[in-house]
A protein has these predicted regions:
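Post-signal peptide N-terminal segment of mature Sec-exported envelope proteins
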Residues: 30-51
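Alpha-helical segments in soluble extracytoplasmic regions
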Residues: 44-121, 125, 139, 143-160
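Bacterial signal peptide processing site
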Residues: 23-26
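Short, low-complexity, Pro/Ser/Thr/Gly-rich segments in the mature regions of secreted, periplasmic
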Residues: 171-195
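C-terminal motif of bacterial Sec signal peptides marking the signal peptidase cleavage site
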Residues: 17-21
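Bacterial N-terminal signal peptides that target proteins for export
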Residues: 1-10
């Protein structure tokens, strides 16, 4: 069960890669917009990567109580990161592309919805009883299933932003580059709680 959860969470790395993907006056405006987003996004990308690494490293050989604690913290961290990413997109203003306002609104709404879903998963994990191994395993399976749904939302949230001129502009920004994950030995403590 834990390996399924870890596999599902690693799919969340797609969001990190999605943020990694973003000529003329339009190109300059797109680059400026992408810089605003990516400068604010970098700490959130790192927070997500650390949270995902904590889940994966704990799931491999952790005790139920350790898995519960790591998953709970990771889901809270990812929810906070998604909220901050939504704020970064909102604060950057309207992207300088056709339907920019709708694009921004959709991305912000989807990121905020994803954050809410991660908090719901956190609650599910918190409610599991790690002393009853069978119920705990069954509960983790439900969490893994929910995680798959959320990851599809995560991917959709930024897929449109990473296309076209915006996608090219975001790809050039250091702040939107793939985060480096902490080593498995550092575990859940690698992700600071402060945003």
């Amino acid at each position: 069960m834990n390996k399924k959860l870890a596999a599902a969470v690693s799919g969340g790395a797609v969001l990190v890669l999605a943020l990694s993907g973003c000529g003329d006056d339009g190109e300059e405006k797109a680059n400026a917009w992408a810089k605003k987003v990516c400068d604010q996004a970098q700490p959130q990308i790192q927070k997500r990567a650390n949270a995902q690494q904590a889940i994966i490293s704990t799931a491999a050989d952790g005790k139920p109580a350790d898995i519960q604690a790591a998953d709970s913290k990771a889901f809270a961290d990812i929810a906070a990161a998604d909220k901050a990413l939504a704020k970064a997109v909102r604060d950057a203003g309207v992207p300088p592309v056709d339907n920019g306002e709708k694009l921004r609104t959709d991305a912000v709404n989807e990121l905020e919805a994803t954050a809410t879903e991660y908090l719901a998963l956190k609650k599910k994990v918190d409610d599991l009883n790690p002393k009853d191994q069978q119920k705990f395993a069954d509960g983790l399976q439900e969490v893994a299933d929910g995680l798959k749904k959320i990851e599809r939302m995560d991917q959709a949230a930024l897929a449109k932003l990473q296309s076209g001129e915006l996608g090219k502009a975001m790809a050039k920004q250091p702040g939107c580059q793939k985060a480096k994950t902490s080593s498995p030995a550092s575990g859940a403590s690698a992700s600071p709680s402060k945003a």
